[in-house]
Amino acid sequence: MLESLFRTHQYLVEHVDAPVRRALMDEINWRDRLIGIKGSRGVGKTTFLLQYARENFSLRDRKCLYINMNSFYFQGHSLVDFAGQFYKSGGQVLLIDQVFKQSNWSQSLRECYDKFPMLRIVFTGSSVMRLKEENPELNGICRSYNLRGFSFREYLNLMAGTNLRPYTLREIENRHERIAREVMAVCDPAKHFASYLHHGYYPFFLEKTNFSENLLKVMNMMIEVDVLLIKQIELKYLDRIKKLLYQLAISGTGAPNVSQLAGDVQTSRATIMNYIKYLSDARLMNMVYRKGEEFPKKPARVMMHNTNLMYAMTPGKVNRQDMLETFFQNALWGRHDVKMGDRSCTFLVDGNQRFRIMDEVPRRKATDVIYVRADITEGNEQEIPLWLYGLLY
């Protein structure tokens, strides 16, 4: 079976279509022995593993092997036994896709870690998985990372043929005028921004199929597999979760009316809050809290995780202001603490930076607020173009 899997590995690596080199590739310490890569369905986790193999090993180098736990072979053979065979044959790096498809996966990874000291394992899993929190056997030995959908920077590099680097939030704040000029010297970001908001986050927009239909299928899989299977929720509750997602999508980006949602979905308030948390873990929604608050308290705002999801859920009815705020929140997600703002600002970031998302000239300015504007391509002092925040990763 090892030979068959090597042939599959060679074919997949040879034919992988990875037109954009993901920023995460350079952020991972590949010398770590156990690396977990989480990400929502559709963001390119499989492609990422194959891209790593192609960059670091020759096609016929048997030191690296990609396997997918969806293979029926692993229904009759343990991961530990297989890893042992690979290790004895001279294997050094085992790339495991969809590791959660095998029961007791975390114990198996721990056993591999203990038994094969020279073997490095890189595995992918659903964004719903809480790798170390729910699997204490991985504490202290596993480094976890998040693979996200395309940033606007990655989308620009692909569509405009540029080679833009990511910038930090501080760089954008302090040097936004210069950065904007440098970017516009090689491409026109305004030409591509609307397309990115509509379909640029998920790499499968490159496939010659209907993007919206594909995204709806992916969203259903997120709920049916990532939420129900991993959270062990009975199938009979599937319709309730889908209805909740729809109700949240059409109600805008404000605070959820938990009592009304509980009545609409026919479940308890506590269950509604748990379902919203699961949808957030699946990267379908984002929960935005006030400063000092967190789950299980009710969030101050519930937003779609990215703007592509907004177009899929409410085609033709996307509120522009909600969309702009969703883009900004998504651009900072995972790397910065984004909280609900007050009357003068939309968001409070990292506890002290105040941002107001706008589509027009501010009538009055507060000196401690950064005005993020969607209606400009170049900024001035504390007014910064919205698209620049798409260069954060």
Model-identified regions with their sequence ranges:
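Conserved lysine of the Walker
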Residues: 45-46
